[in-house]
Amino acid sequence: MNTLKNNAEILDSFRENPDMMAILTIIRDLELKDSWLAAGSVRNFIWNLLSDNPAFDCDTDEDVIFFDPDVSYEETLALENKLREDFPQYQWELKNQVYMHQHSPHTEPYRNSCDAMSKYPERCTAVGLRLHANATLELFAPYGLEDILNFQVRPTPHFLENEDRMKLYQKRLSKKNWQEKWKNLTFKNT
């Protein structure tokens, strides 16, 4: 089994993968405000790498997030469709985080993309990566990377503090079937 020891090794793994760098470049070149490759796109890449599977999985959605109050829901869908047309080799999911709080019970509007990621259901999903114009990579992981590196799935503090959100968390986990692909996952409700 592969091991990653620190953030630099993780970033190097992304940098060395042609598909991930192509995706990150596409996202950067869209010039959307506060944009990131996030959630399962980043988490699954690391889990695959640690499991000695091909790191890039063409079946994984490319979760692109951004935060722009001036871009409507309809415009976001149009941008997502354009991505799918222009780069059909990837499974694009484009979400403006301005609107996404509506999918999480009793949640205030997010302030920015990092605020949104910090309130994702699982700590291992609360992660984002972006490529800057100077070619540096930035990794955002508000709860650290330990849960990802240890194949641990547990709720974020935001989900833990509300019973309705915890029900959504449980429902989500029951649909994901992650353990079929990554056998050594452990699940916790705390």
Predicted regions and their residues:
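Catalytic cores of the polymerase beta-like nucleotidyltransferase superfamily
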Residues: M1-T190
